[in-house]
């Protein structure tokens, strides 16, 4: 009889503890609360929407429904320098250049993403909360670049056994608007739609971490990109300049201006076709995210 009473008491105690644990775990789950979270994409790939991070806010209407608003900003700059030797002696031994050049390329990109969506929280087990939903919004990518080429060389000219050496300095600078230096990426404006599913794990009553996986369709247009080139050539024999001219070109107008800095009578202008890089696009990609948030 004593053993039976002890076993019954132990069973009641266990059930009581289990019930308390369940109630405590339920307290971790949101109910009509507001959360703020920081999310980032841990992977790197070409169509990655936001390169840095995104800030999301969620408002829980009830235990199963939440609306959310997110703002993401990404910024990236890369710089590349290329050194090259100049030697055209093998082409013409009587008139060749020898020297070196340095090319510096700097690409800059900015990404802006703004979206609003709905979440349906369909299951929870203690501290784990599972959800799915959809989101729509604006996604823009902005590109710009600069390229500078500095070359110094010596022209070696031999005529009838007489050799003349001339110092030459060339500088070229390019400014790219709405594209990168290779002109294979152009500024984009578009809308996106995402269906997603995710999970939250509540570490403490107001702190959670989570993961999300979405399938995104992005549609929009690319902007008409343009670039300008300024080229200065200086040819110096001793202390005297024999050439000093500047050439400028704009792809937006298709006009090239040639300015002779030593003799303005040689100035001239030529016209070419203006370029147009505007186009429409549709992209589909998978978008993973790691999240950490706080409940208010």
Regions found by a protein language model. Name each.
Residues 1-30:
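Cleavable N-terminal export/targeting peptides
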Residues 204-296:
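Predominantly the C-terminal beta-signal and adjacent terminal strand-loop region
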Residues 32, 49-53, 108-114, 128, ...:
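Residues that define the transmembrane beta-barrel architecture of outer-membrane proteins
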Residues 26, 43-45, 57, 100-106, ...:
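Outer-membrane beta-barrel proteins
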Residues 20-70, 74-87, 91-94, 269-296:
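Short glycine/proline- and aromatic-enriched beta-strand/turn motifs that initiate or cap beta-hairpins
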Residues 159-179, 252-269:
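Acidic/polar loop-and-plug regions of large Gram-negative outer-membrane beta-barrel proteins
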Residues 21-32, 63-64, 123-130, 203-209:
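Short loop/turn motifs that connect adjacent beta-strands in outer-membrane beta-barrel proteins
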Residues 58-176, 184-193, 201, 294-296:
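Gram-negative (and chloroplast) outer-membrane scaffold detector with strong preference
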């Amino acid at each position: 009889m004593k053993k039976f009473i002890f076993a019954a008491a132990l069973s009641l105690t266990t059930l009581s503890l289990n019930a308390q644990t369940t109630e405590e775990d339920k307290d971790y789950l949101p109910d009509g609360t507001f959360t703020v979270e920081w999310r980032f994409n841990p992977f790197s790939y070409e169509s990655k929407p936001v390169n840095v991070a995104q800030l999301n806010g969620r408002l829980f209407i009830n235990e199963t429904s939440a609306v959310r608003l997110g703002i993401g900003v990404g910024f990236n700059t890369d710089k590349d320098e290329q050194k090259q030797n100049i030697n055209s002696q093998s082409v013409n031994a009587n008139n060749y250049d020898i020297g070196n050049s340095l090319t510096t390329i700097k690409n800059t990109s900015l990404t802006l993403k703004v979206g609003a969506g709905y979440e349906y929280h369909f299951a929870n087990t203690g501290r784990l909360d599972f959800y799915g939903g959809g989101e729509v919004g604006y996604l823009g990518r902005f590109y710009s670049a600069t390229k500078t080429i500095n070359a110094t060389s010596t022209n070696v000219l031999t005529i009838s056994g007489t050799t003349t050496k001339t110092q030459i300095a060339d500088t070229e600078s390019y400014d790219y608007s709405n594209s990168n230096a290779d002109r294979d990426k152009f500024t984009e404006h578009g809308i996106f739609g995402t269906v997603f599913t995710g999970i939250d794990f509540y570490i403490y009553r107001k702190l959670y971490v989570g993961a999300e996986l979405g399938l995104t369709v992005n549609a929009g247009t690319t902007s008409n990109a343009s670039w300008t080139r300024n080229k200065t050539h200086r040819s110096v024999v001793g202390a005297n300049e024999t050439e000093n001219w500047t050439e400028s070109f704009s792809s937006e107008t298709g006009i090239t201006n040639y300015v002779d800095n030593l003799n303005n009578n040689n100035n001239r202008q030529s016209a070419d076709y203006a370029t147009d890089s505007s186009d429409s696009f549709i992209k589909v990609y998978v978008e993973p995210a790691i999240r950490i948030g706080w409940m208010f």
